[in-house]
Amino acid sequence: MQQWRRRQNAVYIGFILPAAAFFAAFFIVPFAESLWLSFTDAYGYNPEQHFVGLRNYREALTNPAFCSALWVTVKYTAFVTLGANLTALALALLLDGNVHCKKLFRAVFFLPNLMSLVIVSFVWVFLYGGVYRSAVALLNIPEAWQISWLGNRRQALYSMGFTAIWQCAGYYMLIYIAGLQNIGASLTEAAAMDGAGPWAMIWHIKLPMLSPVIAMNTVLLMISCFKTFDIPMAMTSGGPAGATTTIALQIYNTAFRSSRTGYATAQSVILFLIISLLTALTFRLQRKGEEE
């Protein structure tokens, strides 16, 4: 019996080893090396590295450029998280009922999510630039009333955020629709028999039942926004005057334009810690939803 168990365990280990080796080679080893680099003064391809302790972390947390990128990322995250959640929830509520061609509408709203973020960014740069300028010229709008969507410090970040909302709202719409379909029909039927209208059903039944889904989507959006790189890089390259430079873009500039590999890695570790906290919160909310 014990010999059979040993053989069975050997088979299990044989199946696990390839995945474990892959995980160690492509995740654990690079992370350990990155963690070590964050404590050194590594510069570009220079093989010489010296241990500097927490100097890179202190510099990052006191550097105005990094703190500015962090604040830009927080504003971008708040805008996109709120906008995408509201848009996705509104679309889900509209397309969950008896709507003609609702499957077609769901596919249409989900389609932008299948497109590359770089392509989406270039399309919206063209809309903000060429199409908008052509429309302004056609309508003879005074220059004082014209909007510089990506050239104004106050508007560039939110123009970029609107692009992100347009691209991702369809994905979160499907998650909300799945949550709405899990709500028992008996609850809505009982509310209808009691005379509850559509708004009362949404406010008192659907939204409370969707609270775990809303929380999960919020955290997923926050994680995605903190990692955003493609949209600011493709649309504005961080401009104007750093108004759209996110943490990920700041790390890229530090590593590949300034060649300060150790310092950039320390910034990456800080970003990793922020995302890890948000990921832990996601798992906690998922477990809470399953328990309920």
List each model region and its residues.
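A structural signal for multi-pass alpha-helical bundles of membrane permease subunits
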Residues: W4-E292
